[in-house]
Amino acid sequence: MAYRIDRQAYAETYGPTTGDRIRLADTELILEVERDFTTYGEEVKFGGGKVIRDGMGQSQQSRANGAVDTVITNALILDWWGIVKADIGLRDGRIVAIGKAGNPDITDGIDIVIGPGTEAIAGEGHIVTAGAIDSHIHFICPQQIETALASGVTTMLGGGTGPATGTNATTCTPGAFHISRMLQAAEGLPMNLGFFGKGNASTAEALEEQVLAGACGLKLHEDWGTTPAAIDCCLSVADRFDVQVCIHTDTLNEAGFVEDTIRAIGGRTIHTFHTEGAGGGHAPDIIRICGESNVLPSSTNPTRPYTRNTLEEHLDMLMVCHHLDPAIPEDVAFAESRIRRETIAAEDILHDLGAFSIIASDSQAMGRVGEVITRTFQTAHKMKVQRGPLPEDAANPRGSRNDNNRIKRYIAKVTINPAIAHGIDNHVGSVEVGKLADLVLWKPGFFGVRPELVIKGGSIIWAQMGDANASIPTPGPVHGRPMFAAFGKALAPSCLTFLSQAAIETDLPNKLGLQRACIPVLNTRTIGKAEMHNNNSLPKVEVDPQTYEVFADGDLLTCDPAEELPMAQRYLLL
């Protein structure tokens, strides 16, 4: 006999289902469940007197016969491809199924077999996202990794050697010696990692040497001289070795203007960092480059979103990061040329239009490594408040009930798009079968601010945890702490290190004594803006050289700075 349960009681028991709506944190962003892969009346849930018990939701199947290692029950998956309710099956550190979990001996339509060897994680009432990817890291200190992990980031790509003056300014790990040491250091860090070599050279030999030493990409930075000759040489090496090139262009226009840089790039794929320009790049019009089909444009989070404090804080940050002297007028003028309210305001709107595809941190070098996801969804909130629903959301025949298209656009900026840009999307960047089980569980009220649980390679690596001497896990002080996957020999199989294919073919991991799985980056040279999910628009962008006003397809792009933001002091005391 069927039993009917009202919608609120159902959501409280099994999590929201199709048509239910959820607010993300304290923003104005409303998510609506698009589909439910579970079966009403056949839901699985763990606990005393509940379903996942021997002979009920738990089968007799062994692991050898197909039972999963872990099941996440009744999860609300938020990813670039959809917003769905489902059970998630994990096995051997990977996602093996998304659908309906249970016991196939007594229930039809089971996609995920629960057996005696299966652990259960309660996904009811939680949003599950892929671990975020921060593709603009200055590896200034190892403490960044824990801070990033605590925010929901599970992959970091960038360059550096520690707090060297070069690293403080540029995301480069220069030379084979330093790349080797950073790859060895990665062995003890609870994060997927990849390192960029220095790409600033006009001849190829030193760049090839770095790729063969394990660099997963090359970085062109103006502080090392991003000339047209260096751009052309670096891209030529990248094309031969299939690694990505990231670029911070010439703010002072000493070696050429933005037109010269576009000409030097020559239609080849390139990831442009802080494409608005406050983080560096041709003043005042580097932002134009986001309209090029071969360019993968990203932002760094200090300008995300545009607020009443954005301009003021940037000057001091810039002086410190780029080793400038406030007593030298030319250094001050250099800094001031990069900070323009008009282009920062336009950046908000270009993100909302899907013309900027990626958001990253610029960690400790004008960016905050623990705020990538927060700043991304603060930007989405600001645009919802100032610009209203996206046309795709407003076109909902039931009225503008949700912000699903906007939410999927912004989640893609910190997950799948940086993965595609850097050739690692076969392994990370989305909640899809076959991918590494790098997953983040959020309580909706804390979404984007403080994860409840971070799963890394199928094992829990970070979680909100109470007093270890308490009788139960929940008494305070509750805060994020590393879990067992971050320790001992469990760390290596839980994480990946990304290298060039050429380095792996020379047996570099064994030569360096690396224990972690070393994965080659692939398909970085044949992609373009069209491959950036939910963020592939190509407006014609123009900048007035006198007023710095930005136009896209002839329309002026401007917005007011935010006076206050969600996901801020309500959650964070410091």
Curated annotation (Swiss-Prot):
Tell me the PROSITE patterns matching this sequence: UREASE_1, UREASE_2, UREASE_3
Q: How is the cofactor bound?
A: Binds 2 nickel ions per subunit.
Q: Where in the cell is it found?
A: Cytoplasm
HAMAP family under this entry? Answer: Urease_alpha
Q: What's the top EC group for this one?
A: hydrolase
One Gene Ontology cellular component term attached to this UniProt record is: cytoplasm
Q: What is the lineage of its organism?
A: Bacteria, Bacillati, Cyanobacteriota, Cyanophyceae, Synechococcales
Query: Can you name the source organism?
Result: Prochlorococcus marinus (strain MIT 9313)
Name this polypeptide is given: Urease subunit alpha
Keywords tagged on the record: Cytoplasm, Hydrolase, Metal-binding, Nickel
